[in-house]
């Protein structure tokens, strides 16, 4: 359920030590979204590397101030779609959008599925989302970093810290990440 995903995600975000990478198509300004935003800002102030990608066209109603607050707290924020003029360029970019919903925490915990960040998943909408640990998280991390670079985000020269080796007690079952 949306409640369960939100509770688990908030707990995992709270426990993040190294990095939080978050990429969402749809990020509302409702109560749950504000709690996640506050948590991201808190973790950035604590020294956790927090990167956030939002799909600009889907979130066009959100004023820049909302994201600027995140930036001031140390969250690195990028728009996936940056519409450019003239109008003919804008039209060709409307189909080049980021529909992913990905969270990677410390390179060890991942979330993906159909749920965006919205209170609508608590009451009206139903979708599937997964919490992943183990080797499969590397595929989500790769997908996020690819989107981050595409969105003009700056990257570190050393990627190894974002791909930690799995501990023996973590899942090593094969999984396929189909990035689209």
Predicted feature locations:
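Charged, low-complexity intrinsically disordered terminal segments
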Residues: 1-180
């Amino acid at each position: 359920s949306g409640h369960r995903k939100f509770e688990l995600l908030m707990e995992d975000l709270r426990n993040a030590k190294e990095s939080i990478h978050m990429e969402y198509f749809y990020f509302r300004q409702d109560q749950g979204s504000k709690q996640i935003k506050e948590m991201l800002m808190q973790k950035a102030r604590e020294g956790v590397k927090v990167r956030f990608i939002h799909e600009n066209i889907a979130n066009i109603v959100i004023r820049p101030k909302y994201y600027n607050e995140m930036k001031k707290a140390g969250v690195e924020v990028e728009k996936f779609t940056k519409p450019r003029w003239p109008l003919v360029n804008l039209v060709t970019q409307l189909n080049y959008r980021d529909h992913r919903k990905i969270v990677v925490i410390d390179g060890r915990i991942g979330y993906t599925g159909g749920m965006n960040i919205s209170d609508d998943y608590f009451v009206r909408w139903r979708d599937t989302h997964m919490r992943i640990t183990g080797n499969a998280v590397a595929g989500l991390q790769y997908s996020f970093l690819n989107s981050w670079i595409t969105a003009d985000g700056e990257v570190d020269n050393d990627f190894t810290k974002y791909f930690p080796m799995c501990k023996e007690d973590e899942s090593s079952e094969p999984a396929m990440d189909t990035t689209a």
